Design a protein with these regions (language model features):
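Acidic interhelical loop/turn segments
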Residues: 152-158
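Core structural elements
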Residues: 158-176
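Positively charged
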Residues: 1-152, 179, 183, 190-193, ...
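Amphipathic alpha-helical segments within well-ordered protein domains
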Residues: 171, 182-185
Length: 215
């Protein structure tokens, strides 16, 4: 996608403790009526939607959770309707965005005016100066954390991916808190994201990977 093709507004899908990064693909099971409407509208237009975490510490006047400022726009690359009227889609992350304002409308789902100017680098294919050897300690600590929480990860398959896919996949799949995942999403670069993962893992290791908060 080119800069000139980026939309000025987008439908947003608030999902707690879930993030998507550029250049990663995730499956989604859509069943709520308002989000079925959202997918229908998206499929009729540009197939784009924004994934964003609700900010559960802040609420609007109607008691609806506010949204975090930063999310990631994705494009629907696969769509299937099930016999019980659910939608099974795959969403490919394209570029992060910042919310400027929420748009008031009669639609059941939420829409926002958005800005991409701080994240144009997400559209580029530049390679960052990171080696797999830089991830060895992170892999070791993550394996301990995942095992402790009962998570099953195909590590061999993960190691065959590119570095950005590996780091972003680990960030998405990790049993981190909402706030911790938001920090990873907002990290300016892949190198910074890798460092943030290491910092979070350090706080967990102090409590034998049972910690649930990070300062």
């Amino acid at each position: 996608m080119k800069k000139v093709d980026l939309p000025k507004k987008i439908a947003v899908f608030p999902l707690s403790n879930f993030i998507i990064f550029p250049k990663t693909t995730v499956p989604l099971n859509i069943f709520e009526p308002r989000y079925l409407d959202m997918i229908n509208d998206s499929m009729k237009s540009n197939k784009l939607l924004g994934m964003i975490q609700p900010n559960l510490s802040k609420h609007q006047s109607n008691n609806t959770p506010q949204l975090h400022e930063i999310g990631c726009m994705g494009k629907i690359t696969s769509f299937k309707e099930t016999d019980d009227s659910r939608y099974l889609i795959e969403l490919k992350g394209l570029i992060r965005f910042k919310i400027i304002s929420e748009i008031q409308s009669n639609k059941k789902y939420r829409e926002c005016e958005i800005d991409f100017k701080n994240f144009y680098g997400d559209l580029e294919n530049k390679k960052e100066d990171i080696k797999f050897s830089d991830l060895e300690l992170i892999f070791k600590d993550l394996k301990s954390l995942f095992e402790k929480r009962g998570f099953i990860i195909n590590w061999k398959a993960l190691e065959k991916q590119s570095l950005d896919e590996t780091i972003n996949a680990l960030a998405m799949a990790s049993p981190f808190t909402i706030e911790e995942k938001q920090v990873l999403l907002e990290a300016e670069s892949l190198n910074i994201r890798k460092t943030k993962i290491a910092e979070i893992l350090t706080t967990y290791s102090f409590d034998q990977y049972n910690n649930t908060t990070v300062q």
